[in-house]
Amino acid sequence: MSLLEINDVNMNYHTKNGATEAIKHLSFNIEEGEFLSIIGPSGCGKSTLLNIISGLLEPSSGKVIYNDPEVKNNLDKMGYMFQKDYLFPWLTVRENVLLGLKIKNILTEENIKNADKLLKSYDLEKFKDHKPTQLSGGMRQRVALIRTLALNPRILLLDEPFSALDYQTRQKVTDDVYEIIKREGKTAIMVTHDLGEAIIMSKRVIVLTKRPATIKDDVEIVFANKDATPFKKRQEPEFNKYFGELWKEIDGVNG
């Protein structure tokens, strides 16, 4: 059974000028432990879809079915990672990581120990008393991810998480984030405009059409070298094959 089912979801916005269809008859499943990327033209409704999955938006019709009771009964089991890290500059790294636990009133001894363990596991312990302004952009994104993981989500929603980083930093951070999500055994859904990023991070890539968004293609991503990091996947022969395939799909959508 799939962890999550998107079942014939439609989203309409109503303004004084009339109704606008944002999403139309969207259906797909997400398996436990899967990393799924969603790509498509700007403004096609990718972020809207993430907000529907997270429960922040109610679809006009259709259903999001959470087959895990832990998620169904507690949508806090979904964690968000945004384009910006949203770290508070006056708090230390550790205080930023613990902030979500504090806000949700679950700052227990066990959860604090888990947060400290995450900081240590991902080489941030020695920076725990630093302020965010003392860190590189890549390290700040790692802190933002650890802050999300400290809440122990079952599903991670990533909305253009690397777009604010320069190219070189981006390559390093994609490796870091991929490894962390893999080691923690999380299910992840990422929205991105970067085809290469989608290929190297994902097991599947869904291509959306222009608004109203429907599914144009659902591509399984398989690399022969299963141990390749995202950075190394760019050098594998399958990368160019998938890039060409997805480029044609996107080019067809934009054409």
What do the PLM-derived regions correspond to, one by one?
Residues I39-P41:
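The feature captures the beta-strand-to-loop junction immediately N-terminal to the Walker
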Residues S54:
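Helix-to-loop junction immediately C-terminal to a conserved catalytic motif
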Residues G62-N74:
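Conserved ABC transporter NBD signature motif
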Residues L91-L98:
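Short coil-to-helix segment of the ABC ATPase nucleotide-binding domain corresponding to the Q-loop/switch region
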Residues H130-T133, L151:
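Conserved signature/switch motifs of ABC ATPase nucleotide-binding domains
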Residues L156-D159:
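Catalytic Walker B motif of ABC-type/P-loop ATPase nucleotide-binding domains
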